[in-house]
Amino acid sequence: EIRDLADVEVNFDGITYAKGASVLKQLVAYVGEEAFRDGLRAYFAEHKWGNTTLSDLTRHLEATSGRDLTSWVADWLETAGVNTLTPVLETDAEGTVTSAHIEQTAVEDWPTLRPHRIAVGAYELQDGALVRTDRWELDVAGERTELPQLVGRTRPALLLLNDDDLGYCKVRLDAV
C-alpha cells in the first residue's frame, strides 16, 4: 500500500524502473512492434483527455495483436520473481545437434513460469571473433520449449538465449 510520496520513494527505485522498462520491452516483443504501435494509437485516440485502466490498454493491444493478454498481465504484472532460461542441446559424435530445447525454471518462493518472447542467436568463431550466424524469435512457454531450428545442424560455438535483450529473464549458457 502506498499512502504518500515517502512510500513512493521507498517502493520505486532503480531496480523497479529497470524491471518496468524490461517488462514493457517484453510486451512489445510479445505482441509485435506494429501491433503495439497500432494498439497505442487506438488507445490514445479513444482515451484522449480521459482516465484509463490497464484493461483499457490491454484491450487495444489484444485487438491489434490477436493475443489474449489476460494471463500475460497476471504472470508479468501481478507476480514477483524472475525466470531462468537454460539451453539444453544433445549432439552426436560428429557434433550435429540431435535434440535442443529451452528449460524454464523459477525460484521456489515465486514459482510462476511466465510466457516469454525472446530472440535466440547462434554464433560461430570467425577470424577469432564471435559472429552471429543465425537469429530467430520464439515464444517460450512452460517448463520446456523445443528448438527445432537447431536439430540437424552443427552445434554452434555459442547459443545465446534472449539475444537482443527482448525478455526479462536470467539466462544460463549451455554446458559446452
Regions found by a protein language model. Give the residues of each.
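Non-catalytic accessory/interaction domains
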Residues: E1-R3, D13-I15, G20-D38, A45-V176
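Active-site flanking loop/helix segments enriched in acidic
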Residues: D7-V8
